[in-house]
């Protein structure tokens, strides 16, 4: 009889779920960040001369490192203007790495072999939350759609610079949102929390 009780306890423990697997705290979530950047090192597959914003961005970037050059003298075939996006996980700490997505916004033919220059990633509040840079990784063929050489990723290519503040430690209460809503799950979760 003692062994049956022990076995039942082990099975119950194995099938018990953690609160974080069943629900999330309302107001605590991942946040999207976005930035505008330049990918360099393209072998003639970058933006053409019709992408004026790319040429202006190259001139601005060069000026920031004390290189004075007229936009009329810039050829942009080895550079592409891109939008850079990332997801800032809830409770991400300063210095944490995040994955980055890079997508061409000009008329570049391919981002293959390119490197993203340092790009600030901002939240919807306009504050800088991360910085991104690094060599691009292009994915393979996606289903029947074929390759998408103007979209790439940089695994762990972003570094968190600013944390999103969550004031949970001093909060007197917290509201939970069930991931798969059911009255039975809500009742069991309430009972488990109140039992502690």
Predicted segments with their positions:
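Mature, extracytoplasmic segments of signal peptide-bearing proteins
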Residues: 1-4, 15-196
């Amino acid at each position: 009889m003692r062994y049956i009780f022990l076995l039942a306890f082990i099975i119950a423990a194995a099938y018990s779920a953690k609160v974080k697997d069943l629900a999330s705290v309302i107001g605590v979530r991942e946040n999207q960040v976005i930035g505008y950047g330049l990918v360099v090192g393209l072998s003639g597959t970058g933006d053409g001369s019709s992408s004026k914003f790319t040429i202006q961005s190259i001139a601005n970037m060069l000026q920031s490192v004390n290189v004075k050059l007229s936009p009329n003298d810039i050829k942009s075939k080895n550079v592409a203007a891109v939008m850079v996006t990332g997801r800032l996980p809830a409770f991400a700490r300063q210095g944490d790495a995040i994955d980055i997505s890079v997508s061409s916004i000009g008329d570049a033919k391919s981002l293959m072999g390119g490197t993203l220059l340092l790009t600030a990633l901002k939240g919807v509040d306009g504050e800088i939350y991360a910085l991104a840079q690094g060599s691009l990784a292009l994915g393979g063929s996606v289903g029947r759609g074929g390759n998408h050489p103007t979209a790439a990723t940089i695994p762990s290519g972003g570094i968190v610079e600013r944390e999103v503040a969550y004031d949970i430690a001093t909060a007197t209460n917290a509201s939970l949102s069930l991931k798969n809503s059911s009255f039975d799950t809500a009742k069991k979760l309430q009972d488990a929390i109140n039992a502690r």
